[in-house]
Structures are given as C-alpha cells and as structure tokens.
Swiss-Prot record:
MF GO annotations: carbon-sulfur lyase activity; O-acetylhomoserine sulfhydrylase activity; pyridoxal phosphate binding
Source organism of the structure: Bacillus subtilis (strain 168)
Disruption phenotype: Cells lacking this gene are unable to grow in the presence of sulfate or cysteine as sole sulfur source, whereas their growth in the presence of homocysteine, cystathionine or methionine is similar to that of the wild-type strain.
Catalysed reactions listed for this entry: O-acetyl-L-homoserine + L-cysteine = L,L-cystathionine + acetate + H(+); O-acetyl-L-homoserine + hydrogen sulfide = L-homocysteine + acetate
Classification via Pfam families: Cys_Met_Meta_PP (PF01053)
Parts of the chain that traverse the membrane: none
Keywords, sorted A to Z: Amino-acid biosynthesis, Cytoplasm, Methionine biosynthesis, Pyridoxal phosphate, Transferase
Annotated positions of the N6-(pyridoxal phosphate)lysine modification: K197
Name recorded for this polypeptide: Cystathionine gamma-synthase/O-acetylhomoserine (thiol)-lyase
EC number: 2.5.1.-
Family: Belongs to the trans-sulfuration enzymes family.
Alphabetical list of SUPFAM superfamilies matching this protein: PLP-dependent transferases (SSF53383)
Cellular-component GO terms for this entry: cytoplasm
PANTHER family tied to this protein: CYSTATHIONINE GAMMA-SYNTHASE, TRANS-SULFURATION ENZYME FAMILY MEMBER
Upper classification of the organism: Bacteria, Bacillati, Bacillota, Bacilli, Bacillales
Amino acid sequence: MSQHVETKLAQIGNRSDEVTGTVSAPIYLSTAYRHRGIGESTGFDYVRTKNPTRQLVEDAIANLENGARGLAFSSGMAAIQTIMALFKSGDELIVSSDLYGGTYRLFENEWKKYGLTFHYDDFSDEDCLRSKITPNTKAVFVETPTNPLMQEADIEHIARITKEHGLLLIVDNTFYTPVLQRPLELGADIVIHSATKYLGGHNDLLAGLVVVKDERLGEEMFQHQNAIGAVLPPFDSWLLMRGMKTLSLRMRQHQANAQELAAFLEEQEEISDVLYPGKGGMLSFRLQKEEWVNPFLKALKTICFAESLGGVESFITYPATQTHMDIPEEIRIANGVCNRLLRFSVGIEHAEDLKEDLKQALCQVKEGAVSFE
C-alpha cells in the first residue's frame, strides 16, 4: 500500500521489534554479534558493517526517497566522501558552481590530489552543460536549491542529458528534504542529505544519508561504506529517527515562516535583494552596505548567528567567513556570494517575533546604535 510521506515519517521504526512490540525503536549499542557456527550469521556481524538501529534509518530514508537502498554516515561530508569512492583518477565531474563551501573544499583540496577534475556550471544553459561533457566525464553533481544563493536546477532536464551520455546524476537534497522534493523520481541516481540539518531538525546530531536508485549501485556503495567506515553510530541513528518523525510538520512551519519573512525583507530599505525560490525554509538576503553586516548580526536578539541550518531555531549565517570561507574570494564573489550576503535558516518560531527581531536590528544598524567594531 502506497502511503503519504507524513505517514511514512510518523511510522519510522514503530514495528521494529515483533517480540516485545515496542513502539520506540531500540538502541542496539553492541559492536559484535554472536554466531551459532561457521556460516551461521544472524545478518549482523560487526557494527561498522551493519547495525539494527542504523538499518532502520537507512530503510526509512530509502522508503521516503523511493530508492532501492539507503546508507547512513557519520556526517554529510562523510556521505559525499564515500560517494567519491565510485570514481578513479582521470575521471571528471560537472558540479554546481554555487556550491556549499565544505563540498568545494573536499573536491578541490582533497580529491584533486587523486586525479579527479571538477568543472563548475550553474545548470541554467543546456548548451553550456553539454559543452563541459567529455569522454572522461562520469557524473553530474547538483545542489538544488544551491547553498547559499537558492538557485533551483531542473532535475528532470539534467537527468535526460546525463542518461543520454551514460553519466551518474547525484543530487544534494538537504534544503528541500523528501517532503518537498524527491530527486530519484525525477531521474537522479543518487541522493544526498546532510541529515544534521532538517531531517534531524534539532541541532543535536551529526549525520549524513545517501539513497541510490538501483540495487547494483547500492551494493557498490555499501562496499565503500563498509571499507571507509564513516558510519552513523546507534545512538545518533535513534536521535535521527526521532527527529524525522516530525519532519513534515516542521517543514510546513519552516516554509510558512520563510514565505512571510521573505516578503517582509523585500519591503525593508536596508535590504538590497532577497533570494528565495518560493518554497522551503531557507532564504538569503543582501544588506545595502557591507559595513552593516557585523553590527546587524550583533543586534539580533532572538535569531541566532550560527553556522548551520535546518533546526527548529532560526539561524543567520555569514557565508563569506563561515560556510564559504575556503572558496577563493574572487571565485566566491564572482559566483554571487558577496560580502553583503547573509543566509537565513528560518525556524519555527512565531513569524511576528522574527520580524520584530529583524526590524529592530536593521533599525539599530541604520541609526548607528550598534558598534561597528
């Protein structure tokens, strides 16, 4: 029976133990599992390879994304690192130009050393994308919407091109989650989540998830996961399951607030522009003057100046010195991540309270009431 995403989320782990009938999934902390004899495994041998609690999370995300197999990692970057093990020296990937700084750092500072080449594209021009495809191209890696400029890519359109050329299509779905977007249904082969963000939702765990479209690729990814070993621990797996149960409710409030806050910010004369695709809980905006950035951040009382996103609390991040600091300044600014840009992870607080906080901070900055030091 096909179920709605809200039901899938609420039911995660609820029938995991038929012996006791426990509703809340157990946390299996054991690192090893007893065998009755040679070749008589229970299916669980060693915690790095497989763990019952982690298995529930992996099955849940595969079910939510309608994929063949899910895999849980110790962080979003560990998930991407393990995906990169699919490639070898000489391979080329085409990647979103407006990319999370941590992913850019991994590609440019780590994987280039092993002979991989990365070409950057905003995926707005089909001819431009096609021109970057060479005989060595193996995959296209897309963030949609991008971090932090909130640019959406047409996954279906890109998928038609990747299939035409026999390329893998990898999509980072962190910002939209399976509630708002399911890339495998649109033609992607691999989906990534930094589950630290919306899926966990409470700023209290570090996790990454991957879902693959077919079992063959899933088995290959599992072998890399087992070999590299950056797996999600049992307790963090349980925390993630607990957070995911309320994902749909939280995303609804994140989105409602973000829509209201985006409209509010567009009316403020201290703001030059607002970047919001119309859905989801993430937006970015630029202040009129660079020198206003630090005083504005200092003046906030409810909204937290912090480097993360997707939690129930509202966060504002300064990409230039936080998430994107490892991208060379000339490249960062050319891509649109200027020194006036702020990224806003809109929480689930009352929208009027968030407006009041923004309003008083902007007012203080404009009137010079906050120290510029």
